[in-house]
Amino acid sequence: MADDLSSVENAGHLWMEGKTLVHLRGDQDRPTHMPRGPAKRTGPGFLNPAMAPARTRSVLLLADALEHDWLVKPGHDIRALDALCATGVRVRRWRNEIPAVHQGRLRVSANDLDETALNWLTTTHDRYPPDTEIDHALEDDRYTRAPSGTMHNGVFVMQNDARIALMEAAYQWVDLDPFGSPVNFLDAAVQGLSRVAFLEVTATDTAALTGSSPSSQQRRYGAKGIVDSYAHDDAVRVLMGLVATTAARHDRCIEPVLALFDGHHVRVSVKVRRSRDGASDVLSSMGWRVREQGGTYRFVHHPDSEQVERASGPMWIGPLWDKTIAERLTEDRTIDLCFPDEDRLERHRDVGLDWSSDDSEYAKRELRRSVRYIADAADLMSRNHTLYHMDDLPNMAGTGQAPKMEALFDEIRTLGYGAARVPDIDPFLVTDAPHDVVLQCVRERCQD
């Protein structure tokens, strides 16, 4: 591969995402610390800073799997693939930010068709290597052939169509992050998993998933949407449903771990295991969201003729998170794992990083935002619950105004129910309280 980075090293500039140095192209602006929405593409292998929170959560989840052994047996390796890696920021963060004690168990592969992006990955990774040196022996693929690619400081780099890369080995961890819809890659992703594995899927075609583009939603996801306060949750559940039914076609079942609507994209993270019985039971977790009078909703497996116009789906109607795992995704854990200490920061500055104390504060704020509200909402999002958009509550309760969120949460909790904020760009309440209890709590707090 040609060393594209060396030829333009004076034109580009350094950035830090998490603990990891990223050499940006000269034609890409220095990112803002709180990006929202998709970045403007500046050429092959562009860095999308708005995806940084998703990459941070990926580091946290993979580190958690290694630390708590919920994916493979204690001491066993995890083979992880970023199937559409672009410039490889995610895999480089895996190597830089997952604790050194676990690095020897982590076998990382990165794949992309874009040669320029891979050049950028390998040269940057070689120039700014991780602290822990990893030199795994190469393993044959599932067809006992020698793999096609090169090893760079613990990252095996391949240049293939993602569907080929996914099918050539059995991975315990697969990240699928396309530019647009993941539909074209899902079958290969599921087939490329080992018997028990973890799959993370990103979709940036939110107009299709929410129903804002009904024709695209029907073509890609076979679903019908309603654009209202629940469109974000619908988008998450439509994508989760597609992953679940795709897995079922290959005699596999899913267990949701985390699922979020994060600005311009939807991302779902699931455990996948081979089970014919589990696959046969997938329809018990599929259904429709039917809007009710008064602004709330309920899930049904099959809407009747009177409900169809008020229904969106089909979608996943089961729990969306794993409580035990999600409640460990705290802000303190994120800073400990993904923010550099002063020694590392000085070493980064020594090689050219322009980074001020204000940059550090902004970066910490961004890292905290990546997981904000997740631990608090973990219990409710892992079982049956109801969502309420805070802006809808005044009309529902007839109060003309909404109470402060924390005050409403406290009121609901005093009655023995759970209440938390959902990590969404909009202010959502998640609770297990009955609808009439929620409205009574709104009225009580609005009288104070």
Positions of the model-derived regions?
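SAM-dependent transferase fold signal centered on methyltransferase-like domains
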Residues: M1-D448
